[in-house]
Amino acid sequence: MVANTTGEIFKVTTFGLSHGKALGATIDGCPAGLNLSNEDIQNELNKRRPGTSNLTTSRDEKDKVEILSGIFNGMTDGTPITAIIFNKDQRSKNYDNLKNNPRPGHGDFCWREKFGNYDYRGGGRGSGRVTIGHVIGGAVSKKLLQQHNITTTAHVTSIHNIHSTKKFTLNTIKENITKNNVRCADLEVATLMEDEILKLKERGDSTGGKVEIIIDNVPVGLGQPVFDKIDGDFAKALMNIGAVKAVEVGCGIESSTLTGHEMNDEYYIEDNKIQTKTNNAGGIVGGMTNGMPIILKISVKPTPSVSGIQNTVNLEKRENSTIEIEGRHDPCICPRITTVAEAVCNMVLADHMIRAGYIHPDKIN
């Protein structure tokens, strides 16, 4: 059995395949009265669209979205919202050799063994292209969260062995990531990152990196202890992005090296607002938001589609074999994954905002 739906009240179901006819999402549980247009969704899809720079796959998809249902007079009507895009630039013949030869690093083997009848073209349902549905769901939830001035910003902090260590204000991050193709706030380091990606692309290799997500203006108390803690839901949502191999909250793995005095975020009150002097917890304690900015970090693996001959097995003959991967692939998925990370975090937030009573489940007040 596959799991294509996420959320308790604000539910997002994604559909489609890399080389199928179409992809999209159905959002159920969005209250009525939210202004929502094609443009709202298209703007987000454009940020993850392939073929926009020499750092991405050359697959030329425009990803033009069409809203099929759930909108009346320019606003949501409380019924399921379905939005779809149609694939235009598939080259399925490049994947003929994958039918019985799973690619190292991809999910081909597991999909084939579990389901048997598996559309292997372009990775099928396991392709990064299916995150189009994530971004559609994220665009709708982003509009909901804007009613409460909640913003989610993801930016690249490292590519391969190149790291950005400078600290920037949130406004500077938002501004700078639009000025380069890797979506890094450090403009000098961004140039080095681009050069590194292009160097690896030239030799048929790939790389990964790290992305930080900052969520601002979140109210206190989102999260449902003990099994629906909000950090657990963020971690699940982010780990469900295919290339993500680790999630950190706040100072993350560094917390294991600190003392209690170093780790604890001390409280203070200013202008009748309770805050913490530091934010090592990343805005989440006890599985609930504490009103400070939420800080999440993800580690993204290298794109597994690389040039050259690799060892694999022939599943039909049950014998060792080799494979040489063709097709068009990203040398580094980090720049495009920022939009997907923002999307899934917004979906989690929208669901918890409704569950906590901050957003009415039936209509926008």
From Swiss-Prot:
Transmembrane segments: none
Coiled-coil ranges per UniProt: none
Entry note: cofactor: Reduced FMN (FMNH(2)).
Catalyzed reactions per annotation: 5-O-(1-carboxyvinyl)-3-phosphoshikimate = chorismate + phosphate
GO cellular component entries: cytosol
GO molecular function: chorismate synthase activity; FMN binding
Enzyme Commission (EC) number: 4.2.3.5
Entries under CDD domains matching the protein: Chorismate_synthase (cd07304)
Listed GO biological process terms: amino acid biosynthetic process; aromatic amino acid family biosynthetic process; chorismate biosynthetic process
UniProt keyword list: Amino-acid biosynthesis, Aromatic amino acid biosynthesis, FAD, Flavoprotein, FMN, Lyase, NADP
Matches recorded under InterPro entries: Chorismate_synth, Chorismate_synth_AroC_sf, Chorismate_synthase_CS
Matches recorded under SUPFAM superfamilies: Chorismate synthase, AroC
Enzyme type, top EC level: lyase
Binding site for FMN: 125-127, 286, 301-305, 328
Involved pathway(s): Metabolic intermediate biosynthesis; chorismate biosynthesis; chorismate from D-erythrose 4-phosphate and phosphoenolpyruvate: step 7/7
Cofactor: FMNH2
Binding site residues for NADP(+): 48
Family affiliation: Belongs to the chorismate synthase family.
PANTHER family according to UniProt: CHORISMATE SYNTHASE
Functional note: This reaction introduces a second double bond into the aromatic ring system.
Alphabetical list of NCBIfam families matching this protein: aroC, PRK05382.1
This protein's name: Chorismate synthase
Organism: Methanosphaera stadtmanae (strain ATCC 43021 / DSM 3091 / JCM 11832 / MCB-3)
The gene coding this protein: aroC
